[in-house]
């Protein structure tokens, strides 16, 4: 969740330049058109801090065309905004082709971000306020925490929310890899509906040869990050992650092109490629088009869960980038956590089965220390001898969606609570354990056993 490996100059200068213009165009386009921010703020706050090379990028915005073009040392990248689906890098396609692809998108509703969240009070309001302050406090000489939003829910009630300057309850914020958990929920909806079998092979078209050992990879193994596929995850030029996200138009095909590094089901490896294979399986299961996939995400998850700000951005093929590209307000990220806290029920409607909610919380068999479940991170054991939890001051039942820069949607069943923290922390400056422990200490442990 930090950027300790995010040195954009590693992997060769050509890779570094290509990666830099790609990420700059993509972040700028999404930041302006999805999040509603000023281009200058996105460039100075999000892009330039990534590396020395990123400080050289020139980003040009065309509001009427819905594009951002990023250039650096003779290389350029273009990202296109399309209403309803956000920004997409124009790779192996054209602006016109992407606009045509979006013509059949279904309409969306709109409403106030906080309409469904009643207010509540913490057991110790002063202590909660102090904990909230600490999450935003910065060293005046060298600010590096960059918390942008913090939301606390308990029993379905909003106990606290706070935002950094330039952000508000109406600002959709990128989840990075926290998006994986949302993609997992869409897979869970298919499983709940009987449209996808966890134990069935993923049936990637690239693996049709009878002697291809990758044919054995199942939906469950992808969900639990034990597919055995080779994948270099660190965000550095030339890695599989940056190549897939910023240099390929069809991300699932790229992930499917990678060889096995281990027998499926035997080794746990956190990586983004498997998630985008699940994204393609989702689209294939619901009709095979971008419009069908977006409509399914909207009608089956976002609308009934009240996540009406959610924008799940696709690649050029139209497949949602489940590994990385969900934007939503902090309150809607909290609604996502609440859906899981409430056993898959929202607004009196069952969205995910109880079995699925138990599945995503359960430790993946191959994950060391039980640190991973079904597309959710867990508070696993970091020291097998001492049996010390990774976050020792937080409950053992905590599980969470987590992404680069410390995007966190943490679910605490024992406290009937959800804590959402979103930001742009390019170091270890944000102390998740300490911050969330202080918040939990300030709120009354809940005796409620049912959905809030």
Predicted regions and their residues:
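Active-site SXXK
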Residues: 156, 174-199, 222, 278-282, ...
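Structured C-terminal helix/loop/strand segments within mature extracytoplasmic catalytic/sensor domains
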Residues: 4-16, 21, 42, 398-452
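Active-site-proximal alpha-helical segments within enzyme catalytic domains
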Residues: 183-184, 273-283, 324-345, 407-423
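Beta-lactamase-like hydrolase cores
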Residues: 115-155
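Active-site Gly/Thr loop motif
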Residues: 307-314, 361-418
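Active-site helix/loop module of the DD-peptidase/beta-lactamase fold
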Residues: 193-230, 257-260, 287-324, 328, ...
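Catalytic-site signature segments of enzymes, centered on catalytic residues
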Residues: 159-172, 235-319, 324
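Short, small/polar residue-rich loop motifs at catalytic or cofactor-binding pockets
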Residues: 144-147, 171, 404-405
């Amino acid at each position: 969740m930090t950027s300790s490996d995010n040195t954009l100059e590693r992997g060769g200068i050509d890779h570094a330049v290509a990666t830099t213009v790609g990420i700059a165009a993509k972040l700028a386009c999404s930041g302006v058109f999805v999040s509603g921010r000023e281009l200058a703020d996105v460039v100075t706050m999000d892009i330039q801090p990534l590396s020395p090379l990123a400080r050289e990028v020139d980003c040009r915005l065309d509001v009427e065309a819905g594009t951002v073009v990023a250039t650096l040392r003779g290389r350029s990248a273009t990202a296109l905004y399309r209403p309803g689906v956000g920004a997409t890098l124009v790779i192996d396609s054209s602006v016109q082709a992407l606009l045509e692809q979006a013509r059949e998108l279904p309409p969306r509703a709109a409403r106030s971000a906080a309409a469904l969240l009643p207010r509540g009070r913490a057991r110790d309001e002063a202590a909660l306020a102090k904990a909230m302050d600490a999450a935003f406090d910065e060293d005046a000489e060298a600010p590096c925490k960059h918390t942008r939003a913090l939301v606390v829910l308990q029993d379905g009630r909003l106990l606290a929310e706070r935002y950094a300057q330039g952000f508000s309850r109406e600002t959709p914020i990128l989840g990075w890899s926290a998006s994986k958990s949302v993609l997992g929920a869409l897979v869970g909806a298919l499983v709940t509906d009987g449209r996808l079998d966890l134990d069935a092979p993923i049936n990637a078209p690239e693996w049709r040869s009878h002697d291809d050992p990758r044919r054995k990879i199942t939906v469950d193994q992808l969900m639990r990050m034990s597919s055995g596929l080779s994948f270099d995850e660190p965000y550095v030029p030339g890695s599989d992650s940056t190549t897939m996200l910023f240099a390929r138009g069809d991300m699932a095909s790229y992930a499917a092109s990678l060889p096995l590094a281990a027998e499926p089901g035997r080794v746990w490896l956190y990586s983004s490629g498997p998630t985008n294979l699940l994204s393609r399986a989702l689209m294939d299961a619901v009709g095979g088009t971008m419009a069908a996939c977006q409509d399914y995400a909207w009608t089956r998850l976002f609308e009934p869960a009240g996540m009406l700000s959610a924008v799940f951005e696709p690649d050029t093929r139209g497949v949602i980038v489940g590994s990385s590209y969900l934007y939503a307000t902090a309150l809607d990220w909290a609604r996502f956590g609440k859906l899981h806290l409430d056993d898959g029920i929202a607004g009196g409607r069952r969205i995910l089965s109880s079995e699925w909610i138990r599945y995503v919380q359960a430790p993946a068999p191959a994950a060391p220390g039980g640190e991973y479940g079904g597309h959710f991170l867990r508070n696993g054991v970091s020291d097998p001898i001492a049996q010390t939890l990774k976050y020792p001051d937080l409950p053992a039942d905590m599980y969470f969606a987590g992404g680069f820069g410390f995007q966190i949607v943490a679910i605490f069943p024992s406290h009937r609570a959800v804590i959402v923290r979103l930001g742009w922390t390019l170091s270890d400056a944000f102390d998740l354990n300490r911050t969330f422990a202080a918040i939990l200490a300030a709120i009354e442990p809940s005796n409620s056993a049912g959905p809030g």
